Swiss-Prot record:
It comes from Methanoregula boonei (strain DSM 21154 / JCM 14090 / 6A8). GO terms for cellular component: cytosolic large ribosomal subunit. Belongs to the eukaryotic ribosomal protein eL31 family. This is Large ribosomal subunit protein eL31. GO terms for molecular function: structural constituent of ribosome. Keywords: Ribonucleoprotein, Ribosomal protein. Signal peptide: none annotated. The gene is rpl31e. Pfam families: Ribosomal_L31e. One of its GO terms (biological process) is cytoplasmic translation. NCBIfam families: PRK01192.1-1.
Length: 88
């Protein structure tokens, strides 16, 4: 198993998902999270944990959260694994 190189906590804004049709907003929010992490962690290989998906879809497809707090870990092989960060 690859060892962790970098670990960051990001608060990702999901405002752009509100500009999509109502029934596509949660899908758009997931794509926005992937795009944000790919840009900031400088890689295209992004894996999202199930907890992120559950948080985005918790209020249905039409009402995703306006922002989400995510812990992203970049492995030695360049892959980014993201999970929902605990609120403190």
């Amino acid at each position: 198993m690859a060892e962790e190189m970098k670990e960051h906590i990001y608060i990702i804004p999901l405002r752009d998902a509100r500009r999509m049709p109502r029934w596509k907003r949660a899908n758009g929010a997931i794509k926005d999270i992937r795009k944000y992490l790919a840009k900031h962690m400088k890689t295209e290989d992004v894996k999202l944990d199930k907890t992120i998906n559950e948080k985005v879809w918790s209020r249905g497809a039409e009402k995703p959260p306006s922002k989400i707090r995510v812990r992203a870990m970049k492995m030695e092989d360049g892959q980014v694994q993201a999970e929902l960060a605990l609120e403190s």
